[in-house]
A protein has these predicted regions:
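Short Pro/Gly-enriched beta-strand edge/turn motifs at strand-loop
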Residues: 14-19, 23-27, 102-108, 178-181, ...
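Hydrophobic, proline/glycine-rich low-complexity stretches
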Residues: 1-16
């Protein structure tokens, strides 16, 4: 009698726009090593403020650009001089486009790197107070844009209330979960199966649920609007009881592990952020739902 090891179904690395950092986590002249898309990378911001995501290994002798040794190193990362990142090993300098622009001890630029793009870089955009990188396994240019949300970029809404998880699953599992209303009753304890109106426009998916929501003061008509643009960027807007906007971001670390970021914002009342009560309860409920989904995702095949 033989036994057979059951392995998780192999799913490819998805392509799209993915969050690699919150904007306020990366100051000018800072850098850090990151690992996304099953690759070692370095994320840095130039002195002028441009965010850059680049292959991590110097083409000279393979030093990691994201691990610096000098006082002028970025926080936990490589040294930034002007717009360039500097290799900690022999101080080769690389532009935001991945071109070697200086070998300080050489009279002439080595032919291997002269006038060439030596390191792969990723298309970057910043909106919703997030740094987004475009990943495609074949290096294709972006096929759609990151959706900018007025709420996420407005001072009339609260600062982001952020939550983060590392989950051993694949982005497709999470996408399928969002389109599976039947599990809400059994996993999340809802009284019934939610019904959604869904529209599709290329990579953009939008959903709408309108319902009467019970409150201590009686029923209140409310709505939940959802949307996504590819596997990396999703949003949910709750209206009715406690207006809440959720920016949900899923970024593949490798083929079996993702980083999930939730950023909640709520409208200010007379310039102030209303805390506690229903406002806090709705956020706790959503975070709790992810915690309920997590063990199922992590142990699926």
């Amino acid at each position: 009698m033989t036994s057979q090891t059951i392995k998780r179904y192999p799913m490819p690395m998805p392509f799209g726009w993915f969050a690699v950092s919150y904007s306020d986590e990366l100051a000018p002249s800072e850098s850090r090593a990151v690992h996304y898309f099953d690759q070692e990378l370095v994320l840095f911001r130039t002195e002028a403020g441009k965010a850059v995501l680049m292959e991590a290994y110097c083409p000279h002798l393979g030093a990691h650009l994201g691990h610096g040794i000098h006082e002028r190193s970025g926080t936990g990362g490589g040294r930034i001089e002007g717009n360039n990142i500097v290799c900690p090993f022999h101080s080769w300098k690389f532009s935001p486009e991945g071109e070697c622009v200086e070998v300080p001890y050489a009279k002439n630029m080595p032919p291997k790197v002269a006038g060439k793009k030596c390191l792969k870089t990723f298309p970057i955009t910043e909106t919703n107070k997030v740094i987004w990188a475009w990943y495609h396994p074949d290096g294709a240019a972006p096929l759609w844009d990151v959706i900018s949300h007025d709420e996420a970029n407005s001072d009339d809404w609260s600062p982001q209330d952020r939550y983060e998880w590392i989950i051993h699953t694949h982005p497709q599992e999470m996408a399928e979960n969002a389109a599976d209303p039947a599990h809400f009753k059994y996993v999340h304890g809802t009284a019934s199966f939610p019904e959604w109106e869904t529209t599709y426009d290329g990579p953009i998916v939008r959903g709408l649920q309108v319902a009467n929501m019970p409150t201590p003061r009686g029923e209140v008509k409310g709505s939940i609007r959802t949307g996504s643009a590819g596997p990396g960027q999703g949003f949910t807007k709750f209206e009715g009881i406690a207006d809440t906007f959720l920016l949900g971001m899923t970024t593949p670390i490798d083929e079996h592990k993702v980083q999930v970021r939730f950023a909640f914002i709520q409208p200010k009342v007379h310039g102030e952020v209303k805390k506690g009560g229903v406002n806090s309860a709705i956020i706790s409920n959503i975070v709790g739902q992810l915690e309920e989904d997590k063990p199922i995702w992590e142990h699926k095949i």
